[in-house]
Amino acid sequence: MEEKNYEVNKKYDEKILINILKNFDKTGEYVVEPGRNEIKKFEIYIENNLKKGNEKKKKNNNIENTETKKMVNVKKFKQKDFIINFFYKFKGSKAKRSYEYAKKLLEYKIRTPEPIAYFDDFVNENNKKNSYYISEELKYDFTCREVFWPEDIERDKAEQGENYKISEETERMLAKVEKNREKIIRQFAKFSFDLHENGVEFEDYSPGNVLIKDKSGNYEFYLVDLNRMKFGVKLNLDKRMKNVSRMMEDEKIARIFANEYAKYCKQREDLVFRYLRHYIRKHKGYVYFKDITRPVRNVFKKKK
């Protein structure tokens, strides 16, 4: 019996989702432009999608269209070569892992956009096979990048000078983050501690992969880009600080994080900070090495 290569959340209509995939290249709005992977958002109708509990809505003609619509994100994974696809047969494709890991996170009450479906080896109208992961589009306020990397914003201002322009909405958001930075960092430290206590090791725990909602000063953290995760892992302090070290670089910010994390893990603050600083510096060195060797690596890629 052939293994099923897709799964759809029971709340959603499979036919609607398949139609989106068939027309992926021609419709939808880009969230992430084509590159290694690409993400588009699509609008679907909830009343056509829910199988139960919608009878009352159908009777009410005054319901606005916005109440019956839902935005979803569809991530299309880049095609892999034969060898990688062979290994995916055993550990699951990135699309499948994203879907299954999202469900598992929700079981742990760890926030992530609602998983809707995954499809492996889906053949589109151009007769090309790709894998897709579909999830709800999350309306968030900012990411960990704005919280932990304020120096990036200052660098952009310096480099662009008079050409530096951002919307009023973005300016208000950055001002709010600046005002509440320490509070957000401390709440994120508690979130990270809970993640580790649940035995979850998010291997891509980086600033762009944590979306944040501001609920009147209480911050909700959502994990995205989930295909590299481990569950049921016993994490000592060394592994925990290594896990979060890609999230930050500024030592003042790291000290705030370490101070708060130490309260929950019942370890000395200086010890937590020492582990964290060690891995921050190690990762910084790794990034620097990659940057200076990039031209050489690009030459070899071209030869291939």
Please give the residue ranges for each predicted region.
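Hydrophobic residue at the +6 position relative to the catalytic HRD Asp in the kinase catalytic loop
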Residues: 205, 210-212
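C-lobe/activation-segment region of protein kinase-like
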Residues: 219-298
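Conserved ATP-binding subdomain of kinase catalytic cores across diverse folds
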Residues: 18-142, 158-166, 197
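Short acidic, glycine/proline-rich loop/turn micro-motifs
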Residues: 83-88, 146-149, 233-238
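Juxta-kinase regulatory segment immediately upstream of eukaryotic protein kinase catalytic domains
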Residues: 1-29
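Short, low-complexity Ser/Thr-rich regulatory SLiMs
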Residues: 122, 212-214
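Alpha-helical membrane-targeting segments
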Residues: 79-93, 125-127, 273-304
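Conserved kinase catalytic-core helix
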Residues: 104, 141-203
